[in-house]
């Protein structure tokens, strides 16, 4: 039996949702979804109130997902305009720079509103219209949030690209969504190092197919020298500063696109996950308020980057729609020292802290002292996101960071889901280290076997969701068939998450990790096919296979098996060259942790690579290879086992 940490009665006494309320609200949300979400829609401010709440069919011959379909609203109005009357002087975003020696500063709701309006006007003057796509490739600075909200204000669809991605990854995303304009910065700062953002954009725009980009706006952030190409490149401040501080918001239908965010799939090409305006915004704000038990005076800090969905939902859209104060942190957990997170918590008196298991595991390695030399007395709630948290890391987080007095909300969700789907509510649900516990309102998880049969009781299987929720993605941008095939064809009538899961006797859910060809590295999804195609594009590589393996800090690491073309011999230099080749093609997050030279790969007689075998070798479990008799050349396996890098 897993440890159980009961709800703290003092926390429950003041919580937004109690145990009894959770049970009643969850029941209503499943039995009467139109009634439940119709009431929840009153959280938002509408130009036109919706009368149609839910219109969903997962049937393959009549597939559609629509929420609040006749409603009209604007996301930026909900995040900014409606806060001005009562919260105009309240801090919306609290910027904390990469270096503690640089100045942190608050941005109020009124200041943020004016900055967004100025940029919205500038974008309109540059010819950006409703429905046009704008690529945002910025560091974790306030202008990243400004850019997202300015797009939302004028009805443009933003596509944020994580600042750690390289030129090819930027180009892929620009080409896929036919972006009209890019907003970037001269350079980013991360852990004291400069990231050449503008130079990466320049390199991306030399790649064929990117010529839809008419303008590049460049934020002067570090002041580093960059090449400016007239008339395409313009300094952000030159274009924005003189604009009026009011901007007429576009009236958006509830189902109009709000943003595209690319995520790795099990095939090589990243998927453009499309989220729409009303359902996404409602779900992000509702989950943010309830899961984090939000109060008016909270200082909330989510350490994610806006380049990922966690930054979209739980730094920008959720907190601002709720009138909260959110910390925006440019830095990393271990620069200039490993106390940085805890020093920032004390400096800004952070009350709610939301981070990834990878960061926790990395900081655990340095022991309790760097944590204990800070106070952290302001904290009242901790959260975890991005990957399953192992019980050891959960306990360390609870006991060392939270001094055994702050509940932990271990949240499970995905880019595709828009917001949190399974998580404890700290005033309502007892905690178990390593379990995401119970579903949020309107979320119906089920476990199925390989044939799609629903499994009851305490069991393990593939995690599916039986019905829709407002924050659900609506399509893969430009490829609706891929959306249906990826998520709804495997188990017809339900959404397939791609995750394995176990349910215990108390009905708690324990996510066990991906069951497809996607690796979760530090909470970031990397498609094995993406890394394989990057490796194979090197002139000396004949073939490559990539799998995940358990990693103490990152959760999963990347293990690559590489076969060279005839006449090439493995060397340390070539090893280094291939690792940096992947960094250049995709970005540092995709760098292989292990790269093993392979004389051949284990294949069936039909030529299919047996990844199951490669995974077991990478996991250092050569005794669990199973049946290898169907392989075209079983001797390949012996050689790979003998040369394995995982010991």
Swiss-Prot record:
Its EC number is 6.2.1.1. It comes from Xanthomonas axonopodis pv. citri (strain 306). CoA binds at residues 190-193, 310, 334, 522, 583. It catalyses: acetate + ATP + CoA = acetyl-CoA + AMP + diphosphate. PANTHER family: ACETYL-COENZYME A SYNTHETASE, ACETYL-COENZYME A SYNTHETASE 1. This is Acetyl-coenzyme A synthetase. Acetylated. Deacetylation by the SIR2-homolog deacetylase activates the enzyme. Mg(2+) binds at residues 536, 538, 541.
């Amino acid at each position: 039996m897993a440890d159980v940490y009961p709800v703290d009665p003092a926390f429950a006494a003041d919580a937004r949702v109690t145990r009894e309320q959770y049970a009643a609200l969850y029941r209503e949300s499943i039995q009467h979804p139109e009634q439940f979400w119709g009431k929840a829609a009153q959280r938002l401010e509408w130009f036109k109130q919706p009368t149609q709440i839910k219109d969903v069919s997962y049937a393959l011959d009549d597939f559609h997902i629509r929420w609040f379909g006749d409603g009209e609203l604007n996301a930026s109005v909900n995040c900014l305009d409606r806060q001005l009357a009562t919260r105009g002087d309240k801090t919306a975003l609290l910027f904390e720079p990469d270096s503690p020696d640089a100045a942190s500063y608050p941005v109020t709701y009124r200041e943020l509103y004016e900055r967004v309006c100025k940029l919205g006007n500038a974008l309109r003057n540059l010819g950006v219209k409703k429905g046009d796509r704008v690529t945002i490739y910025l560091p974790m600075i306030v202008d990243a949030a400004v850019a997202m909200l300015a797009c939302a204000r004028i009805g443009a669809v933003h596509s944020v690209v994580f600042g750690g991605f390289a030129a090819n990854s930027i180009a892929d995303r620009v080409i896929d969504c036919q972006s009209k304009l890019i907003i970037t910065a001269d350079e980013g700062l991360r852990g004291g190092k400069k990231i050449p953002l503008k130079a990466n954009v320049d390199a991306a725009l030399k790649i064929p197919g990117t010529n839809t980009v008419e303008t590049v706006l460049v934020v002067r952030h570090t002041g580093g020298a960059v090449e400016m190409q007239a008339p395409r490149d313009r300094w952000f401040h030159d274009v924005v500063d003189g604009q009026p501080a009011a901007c007429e918001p576009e009236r958006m239908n509830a189902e109009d696109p709000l943003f595209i965010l690319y995520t790795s799939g099990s095939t090589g090409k990243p998927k453009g996950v499309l989220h729409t305006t009303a359902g996404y915004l409602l779900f992000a704000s509702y989950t943010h308020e309830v899961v984090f038990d939000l109060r008016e005076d909270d200082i909330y800090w989510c350490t994610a980057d806006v380049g990922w969905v966690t930054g979209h939902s739980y730094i920008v859209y959720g907190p601002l729609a709720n009138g909260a104060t959110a910390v925006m942190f440019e830095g990393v957990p271990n620069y200039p020292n490993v106390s940085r997170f805890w020093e920032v918590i004390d400096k800004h008196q952070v009350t709610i802290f939301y981070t990834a298991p990878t960061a926790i595991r990395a900081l655990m390695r340095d022991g309790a002292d760097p944590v204990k030399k800070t106070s952290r007395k302001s904290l009242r709630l901790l959260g975890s996101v991005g990957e399953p948290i192992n019980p050891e890391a959960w306990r360390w987080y609870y006991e060392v960071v939270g001094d055994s007095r702050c509940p932990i909300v271990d949240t499970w969700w995905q880019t595709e889901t828009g917001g949190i789907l399974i998580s404890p509510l700290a005033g309502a649900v007892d905690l178990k280290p390593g379990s995401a516990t119970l579903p949020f309102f309107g979320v119906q998880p089920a476990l199925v076997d390989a044939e799609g049969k629903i499994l009851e009781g305490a069991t393990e299987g593939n995690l599916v969701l039986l019905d829709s929720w407002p924050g659900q993605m609506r399509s893969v941008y430009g490829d609706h068939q891929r959306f249906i095939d990826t998520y709804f064809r495997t188990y017809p009538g339900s959404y397939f998450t791609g995750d394995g899961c176990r349910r215990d006797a108390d009905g708690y859910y324990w996510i066990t990790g991906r069951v497809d060809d996607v690796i979760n590295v530090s909470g970031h999804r990397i498609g094995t096919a993406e890394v394989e195609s990057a490796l194979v594009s090197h002139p000396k590589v004949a073939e490559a296979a990539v799998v995940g393996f358990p990693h103490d800090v990152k959760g999963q690491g990347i293990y690559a098996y590489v076969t060279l073309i005839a006449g090439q011999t493995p060397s340390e230099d070539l090893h280094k060259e291939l690792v940096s080749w992947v960094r250049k093609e995709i970005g540092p997050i995709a760098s292989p942790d292990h790269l093993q030279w392979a004389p051949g790969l284990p294949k069936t007689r039909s030529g299919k690579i047996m990844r199951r075998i490669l995974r077991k070798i990478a996991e250092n479990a050569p005794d669990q290879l199973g049946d290898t008799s169907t392989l075209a050349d079983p001797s390949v396996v012996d050689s790979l086992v003998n040369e394995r890098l995982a010991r």
